[in-house]
């Protein structure tokens, strides 16, 4: 089973990962999670690349103690990842991919449907209520909120798993499959040293990124780190320190009452 991770870049609270684990257990086959960062999106720059690669470091820590074979991959030539996706799908039972409504992840999901030699299953991890549940569009935020208030209890009882990796059976390693797929696609793997250097958001990290065809004018933000572990820390701080007054303070920037999650 291949989980091609494009938008829900986390190892917890992720419906797509939950589904991929179910499939791997059902078929007793290795689960390979490929977290890909492509060059082809319009705003590819040093800041976004650094932020995403910091998340890859977090995910590697979370996945390494599980049977998941985790593959962080950074594209070095445009459209390179398409051949890699096709290579991974060749002998796969299924490809699971994030279902995201706009932009690059949506385009990648559509390409996957066209390229893959196996079943492609798109899974929505954008929120508690599936995007397609309303079966209609909303002309105002107010009407959407009313729908949420009326229907959220229908979905909140089945949240994604907070620790899905414990549910994965010992399905074996997919490392040999990964090596073969990269060779067949004639695509270089991404060295862990490169990801680590970039994630440090230092001069060395910017030098490492200089070889990529992206916008180097938009620099990383040194005091803001990406990744799911940082996100969980920020969420915890918001819940413990600001949630009770959020409804009052959020519209007064000088009070510092925002969520800090945007």
Where are these predicted regions, by residue range?
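Glycine/tryptophan-enriched, flexible segments
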Residues: 137-262
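Trp/Phe/Arg-rich N-terminal binding region typifying the photolyase-homology
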Residues: 1-172
